[in-house]
Swiss-Prot record:
Keywords from the named record: Oxidoreductase
GO function terms (MF aspect): oxidoreductase activity
GO cellular component terms given for this protein: cytoplasm
Disulfide bonds: none
Protein name as it appears in the record: Alcohol dehydrogenase-related 31 kDa protein
Annotated active site: 152 (proton acceptor)
Keyword Oxidoreductase: yes
Length: 272
């Protein structure tokens, strides 16, 4: 179990929908500090969060997840002045715009990766940090493909690949930073938007999705926090239909074990 009591949490996302509901649950867990970095100001949401737990310090920065890493560094230098340290980094910025592939990939994948690369040195035990947990909030169509939202699905597959790679013991044994992902199923805030399919052939499906049964954002937010509390390094969870399910990870490349053994053997030889 991962105990959130007294933790310093940094949430990179829009403070609305799933992120807001997740933050509400976090505020009930006696966290000490919450930093919110998002693209637009939302003082009403911040006030709502503060009313849940007045003793928890909340900080806010306007943040563009697609900015250059050098600019991100400037932001997180300021974040660290207020936060002192980060125990939990949650990446939840998301965009589904099949007509703008670059923006979709940059928001969902590249921006998340750059944010992680920027924050990791502050958390890394080898660099003076205390370790911690990185949580990547992604989608179930990062596990199974979507013929309708092809660009969005590709970006979410990338999140899963990045999460599993960064969670490898090669890193975790050194930096003490666990990495996990939560894949959200269809959620009301998502399907209520006007959604465009990657190709016109899929538009009728995209239109029908708005009438499909979906979980509420509040239930999804609760299960994201539940997954955090139950997390172990490298785990992938599905938060869908009001439930929480641990993904059974599978290796498809039959050479994976041999290749890893080869790399480890060469590393040992280099140290001799």
């Amino acid at each position: 179990m991962f105990d959130l009591t007294g933790k310093h949490v940094c949430y990179v996302a829009d403070c609305g929908g799933i992120a807001l509901e997740t933050s509400k649950v976090l505020m009930t867990k006696n966290i000490a500090k919450l930093a919110i970095l998002q693209s637009t100001e939302n003082p009403q949401a911040i006030a709502q969060l503060q009313s849940i737990k007045p003793s928890t310090q909340i900080f806010f920065w306007t943040y563009d997840v697609t900015m250059a890493r050098e600019e991100m560094k400037k932001y997180f230098d300021e974040v660290m002045v207020q936060m002192d340290y980060i125990d939990v980094l949650i990446n939840g910025a998301t965009l589904c715009d099949e007509n703008n592939i670059d923006a979709t990939i940059n928001t969902n994948l590249t921006g998340m990766m750059n944010t992680v690369a920027t924050v990791l040195p502050y958390m890394d035990r080898q660099m003076g940090g205390s370790g911690g947990l990185i949580v990547n909030v992604t989608s179930v169509i990062g596990l199974d493909p979507s013929p309708v939202f092809c660009a969005y699905s590709a970006s979410k597959f990338g999140v899963i690949g990045f999460t599993r790679s960064l969670a490898d013991p090669l890193y975790y044994s050194q930096n003490g930073v666990a990495v996990m992902a939560v894949c959200c199923g269809p959620t009301r805030v998502f399907v209520d938007r006007e959604l465009k399919a990657f190709l016109e052939y899929g538009q009728s499906f995209a239109d029908r999705l708005r009438r499909a049964p979906c979980q509420s954002t509040s239930v999804c937010g609760q299960n994201i926090v539940n997954a955090i509390e139950r997390s172990e390094n490298g785990q992938i969870w599905i938060a869908d239909k009001g439930g929480l399910e641990l993904v059974k990870l599978h290796w498809y490349w039959h050479m994976a074990d041999q290749f890893l053994h080869y790399m480890q053997s060469n590393d040992e030889e280099d140290q001799e």
